[in-house]
Regions:
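Phosphate/nucleotide-binding beta-alpha loop and adjacent structural elements of enzyme active sites
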Residues: 2-238
Length: 238
Protein backbone atom coordinates (compact mmCIF):
# COMPACT_ATOMS: atom_id res chain seq x y z
CA UNK A 1 0.00 0.00 0.00
CA UNK A 2 1.00 3.63 -0.41
CA UNK A 3 0.19 6.56 1.82
CA UNK A 4 -3.14 8.30 1.57
CA UNK A 5 -3.12 11.35 -0.67
CA UNK A 6 -3.56 14.50 1.35
CA UNK A 7 -6.14 16.65 -0.38
CA UNK A 8 -6.93 20.27 0.57
CA UNK A 9 -10.34 20.85 2.11
CA UNK A 10 -11.45 22.86 -0.92
CA UNK A 11 -10.67 19.90 -3.18
CA UNK A 12 -12.54 17.51 -0.89
CA UNK A 13 -15.58 19.78 -1.08
CA UNK A 14 -15.37 19.88 -4.88
CA UNK A 15 -15.12 16.09 -5.01
CA UNK A 16 -18.32 15.80 -2.99
CA UNK A 17 -20.12 18.40 -5.12
CA UNK A 18 -18.94 16.78 -8.35
CA UNK A 19 -21.29 13.85 -7.69
CA UNK A 20 -24.31 16.15 -7.91
CA UNK A 21 -26.33 16.57 -11.09
CA UNK A 22 -27.06 19.86 -12.80
CA UNK A 23 -25.16 23.15 -12.76
CA UNK A 24 -23.62 22.66 -9.31
CA UNK A 25 -22.12 19.30 -10.23
CA UNK A 26 -20.92 20.50 -13.63
CA UNK A 27 -19.28 23.56 -12.12
CA UNK A 28 -17.59 21.49 -9.41
CA UNK A 29 -16.23 19.01 -11.96
CA UNK A 30 -14.73 21.80 -14.08
CA UNK A 31 -13.07 23.44 -11.07
CA UNK A 32 -11.82 20.09 -9.79
CA UNK A 33 -10.33 19.26 -13.18
CA UNK A 34 -8.44 22.56 -13.34
CA UNK A 35 -7.05 22.24 -9.82
CA UNK A 36 -5.99 18.61 -10.03
CA UNK A 37 -4.44 18.96 -13.48
CA UNK A 38 -2.14 21.62 -12.05
CA UNK A 39 -1.40 19.35 -9.11
CA UNK A 40 -0.67 16.46 -11.50
CA UNK A 41 1.89 18.50 -13.45
CA UNK A 42 3.57 19.60 -10.22
CA UNK A 43 3.72 16.04 -8.91
CA UNK A 44 5.17 14.87 -12.23
CA UNK A 45 7.95 17.46 -12.10
CA UNK A 46 8.74 16.53 -8.50
CA UNK A 47 9.04 12.87 -9.45
CA UNK A 48 11.23 13.75 -12.44
CA UNK A 49 13.66 15.38 -10.02
CA UNK A 50 14.12 12.06 -8.21
CA UNK A 51 14.98 10.03 -11.33
CA UNK A 52 18.45 9.04 -12.45
CA UNK A 53 20.41 6.59 -14.62
CA UNK A 54 19.42 3.62 -12.48
CA UNK A 55 15.70 4.18 -13.08
CA UNK A 56 13.36 2.90 -15.79
CA UNK A 57 10.44 4.91 -17.20
CA UNK A 58 7.82 4.26 -19.87
CA UNK A 59 6.06 6.72 -22.16
CA UNK A 60 2.89 5.18 -23.60
CA UNK A 61 1.60 7.27 -26.48
CA UNK A 62 4.85 9.17 -26.99
CA UNK A 63 3.49 11.16 -29.96
CA UNK A 64 6.07 13.89 -30.71
CA UNK A 65 8.28 12.95 -27.76
CA UNK A 66 7.75 15.94 -25.47
CA UNK A 67 7.44 13.81 -22.33
CA UNK A 68 10.00 11.30 -23.62
CA UNK A 69 12.49 14.17 -23.80
CA UNK A 70 11.85 15.15 -20.19
CA UNK A 71 12.22 11.58 -18.98
CA UNK A 72 15.40 11.06 -21.00
CA UNK A 73 16.97 14.23 -19.60
CA UNK A 74 17.05 12.61 -16.15
CA UNK A 75 19.40 9.92 -17.44
CA UNK A 76 16.81 7.20 -16.82
CA UNK A 77 16.27 4.33 -19.25
CA UNK A 78 13.17 5.31 -21.23
CA UNK A 79 10.93 3.03 -23.29
CA UNK A 80 8.65 5.05 -25.55
CA UNK A 81 5.71 3.42 -27.37
CA UNK A 82 4.08 5.08 -30.37
CA UNK A 83 2.02 3.17 -32.99
CA UNK A 84 1.52 5.95 -35.55
CA UNK A 85 4.23 5.64 -38.24
CA UNK A 86 4.24 9.40 -38.86
CA UNK A 87 5.03 10.15 -35.23
CA UNK A 88 7.41 7.24 -34.91
CA UNK A 89 9.50 8.52 -37.80
CA UNK A 90 9.85 11.89 -36.05
CA UNK A 91 10.71 10.16 -32.77
CA UNK A 92 13.41 8.12 -34.50
CA UNK A 93 15.05 11.29 -35.79
CA UNK A 94 14.61 13.22 -32.54
CA UNK A 95 16.20 10.57 -30.32
CA UNK A 96 18.75 9.12 -32.74
CA UNK A 97 21.63 10.11 -30.46
CA UNK A 98 19.94 9.22 -27.15
CA UNK A 99 21.30 5.87 -26.04
CA UNK A 100 18.97 5.75 -23.02
CA UNK A 101 15.82 6.04 -25.18
CA UNK A 102 14.34 2.86 -26.65
CA UNK A 103 11.58 3.38 -29.22
CA UNK A 104 8.81 0.86 -29.91
CA UNK A 105 6.52 1.26 -32.93
CA UNK A 106 3.61 -0.44 -31.17
CA UNK A 107 0.36 0.34 -29.43
CA UNK A 108 -0.19 -0.86 -25.87
CA UNK A 109 -3.43 -2.25 -24.47
CA UNK A 110 -4.55 -4.99 -22.09
CA UNK A 111 -4.05 -7.79 -24.63
CA UNK A 112 -1.64 -8.36 -27.50
CA UNK A 113 -2.63 -8.64 -31.16
CA UNK A 114 -3.21 -6.22 -34.01
CA UNK A 115 -5.82 -3.49 -34.40
CA UNK A 116 -6.71 -0.62 -36.69
CA UNK A 117 -5.33 2.73 -35.63
CA UNK A 118 -7.98 5.32 -36.44
CA UNK A 119 -6.80 8.64 -37.83
CA UNK A 120 -8.88 11.81 -37.99
CA UNK A 121 -10.44 13.09 -41.20
CA UNK A 122 -8.12 16.12 -41.06
CA UNK A 123 -4.93 14.16 -40.40
CA UNK A 124 -3.10 15.35 -43.54
CA UNK A 125 -3.90 19.01 -42.82
CA UNK A 126 -1.87 19.06 -39.59
CA UNK A 127 -0.55 15.60 -38.69
CA UNK A 128 1.40 16.80 -35.66
CA UNK A 129 -1.81 18.03 -34.02
CA UNK A 130 -4.23 15.47 -35.45
CA UNK A 131 -2.02 12.53 -34.47
CA UNK A 132 -2.75 13.35 -30.83
CA UNK A 133 -6.25 11.94 -31.39
CA UNK A 134 -5.25 8.73 -33.20
CA UNK A 135 -6.83 5.78 -31.39
CA UNK A 136 -7.23 2.01 -31.53
CA UNK A 137 -10.39 2.27 -29.41
CA UNK A 138 -12.53 5.25 -30.44
CA UNK A 139 -13.50 3.93 -33.89
CA UNK A 140 -17.10 5.19 -33.83
CA UNK A 141 -16.23 8.83 -33.24
CA UNK A 142 -17.32 11.12 -36.10
CA UNK A 143 -13.89 12.77 -36.25
CA UNK A 144 -12.32 9.61 -37.70
CA UNK A 145 -12.12 8.49 -41.33
CA UNK A 146 -12.22 4.67 -41.68
CA UNK A 147 -10.34 4.89 -44.98
CA UNK A 148 -7.36 6.45 -43.19
CA UNK A 149 -7.05 3.71 -40.57
CA UNK A 150 -3.86 1.66 -40.49
CA UNK A 151 -3.13 -1.75 -39.01
CA UNK A 152 -0.73 -1.65 -36.04
CA UNK A 153 0.81 -4.16 -33.68
CA UNK A 154 -0.51 -4.15 -30.12
CA UNK A 155 1.47 -5.42 -27.14
CA UNK A 156 0.03 -6.28 -23.73
CA UNK A 157 0.73 -3.85 -20.90
CA UNK A 158 1.64 -6.61 -18.46
CA UNK A 159 4.10 -8.06 -20.98
CA UNK A 160 5.73 -4.65 -21.41
CA UNK A 161 6.30 -4.44 -17.65
CA UNK A 162 7.39 -8.01 -17.07
CA UNK A 163 9.74 -8.21 -20.06
CA UNK A 164 11.82 -5.39 -18.60
CA UNK A 165 12.59 -7.42 -15.46
CA UNK A 166 13.01 -4.09 -13.68
CA UNK A 167 11.10 -1.84 -11.34
CA UNK A 168 9.41 0.90 -13.40
CA UNK A 169 9.60 4.16 -11.50
CA UNK A 170 7.23 6.21 -13.67
CA UNK A 171 4.76 5.67 -16.49
CA UNK A 172 3.04 8.37 -18.50
CA UNK A 173 0.01 7.11 -20.41
CA UNK A 174 -1.92 9.04 -23.08
CA UNK A 175 -3.38 6.40 -25.38
CA UNK A 176 -6.80 7.73 -26.38
CA UNK A 177 -9.12 5.25 -24.68
CA UNK A 178 -6.93 2.17 -24.29
CA UNK A 179 -6.13 3.27 -20.75
CA UNK A 180 -9.46 1.90 -19.53
CA UNK A 181 -8.65 -1.67 -20.51
CA UNK A 182 -5.24 -1.33 -18.87
CA UNK A 183 -6.78 0.06 -15.68
CA UNK A 184 -9.21 -2.87 -15.64
CA UNK A 185 -6.25 -5.21 -16.00
CA UNK A 186 -4.26 -3.53 -13.22
CA UNK A 187 -7.19 -3.65 -10.80
CA UNK A 188 -8.06 -7.26 -11.66
CA UNK A 189 -4.45 -8.34 -11.20
CA UNK A 190 -4.24 -6.61 -7.84
CA UNK A 191 -7.52 -8.19 -6.71
CA UNK A 192 -5.99 -11.57 -7.56
CA UNK A 193 -2.82 -10.87 -5.61
CA UNK A 194 -0.59 -9.76 -8.49
CA UNK A 195 1.32 -6.54 -7.84
CA UNK A 196 3.30 -5.18 -10.79
CA UNK A 197 6.70 -3.53 -10.14
CA UNK A 198 5.45 0.00 -10.78
CA UNK A 199 5.86 3.26 -8.89
CA UNK A 200 3.67 6.03 -10.31
CA UNK A 201 1.35 6.24 -13.32
CA UNK A 202 0.27 9.55 -14.84
CA UNK A 203 -2.73 8.87 -17.08
CA UNK A 204 -4.85 11.10 -19.28
CA UNK A 205 -8.29 9.51 -19.15
CA UNK A 206 -10.88 10.00 -21.89
CA UNK A 207 -14.15 9.27 -20.13
CA UNK A 208 -15.64 12.39 -21.76
CA UNK A 209 -15.59 10.36 -24.99
CA UNK A 210 -16.54 7.09 -23.28
CA UNK A 211 -19.04 7.97 -20.50
CA UNK A 212 -19.60 4.31 -19.65
CA UNK A 213 -16.07 4.32 -18.19
CA UNK A 214 -16.66 7.17 -15.76
CA UNK A 215 -17.35 4.82 -12.83
CA UNK A 216 -14.04 3.04 -13.40
CA UNK A 217 -12.10 6.31 -13.30
CA UNK A 218 -14.00 7.41 -10.22
CA UNK A 219 -13.21 4.18 -8.37
CA UNK A 220 -9.51 4.36 -9.29
CA UNK A 221 -9.31 7.93 -8.00
CA UNK A 222 -10.97 7.07 -4.70
CA UNK A 223 -8.77 4.00 -4.23
CA UNK A 224 -5.64 6.05 -4.93
CA UNK A 225 -6.61 8.90 -2.63
CA UNK A 226 -7.40 6.41 0.14
CA UNK A 227 -4.06 4.63 -0.25
CA UNK A 228 -5.76 1.33 -1.10
CA UNK A 229 -3.56 0.61 -4.14
CA UNK A 230 0.15 -0.26 -4.21
CA UNK A 231 0.68 2.29 -6.99
CA UNK A 232 0.23 6.04 -7.24
CA UNK A 233 -2.24 6.39 -10.13
CA UNK A 234 -2.84 9.98 -11.19
CA UNK A 235 -5.76 10.18 -13.61
CA UNK A 236 -5.62 13.96 -14.00
CA UNK A 237 -2.69 14.09 -16.39
CA UNK A 238 -3.56 16.83 -18.91
Amino acid sequence: MIDRVRLPLTVKVLIALADLKGKVGNSARRKLLRRLRKRSLLDFEQRLATLGPRDVCIDLGANMGVVTEKLAATGAEVHAYEPDPYCFDLLTKRFADKENVHLHNQAVSATAGSLLLQRTRDFEIDPEIQSQSSSIIRSNDAIYDPEKSIKVEVVAFNDVIRDLHRYVALIKMDIEGSEFEILDCILDDYANGCVLPIGALFIETHERHMPNRFDLVKSVRKATWSGLLPYRIDTYWP
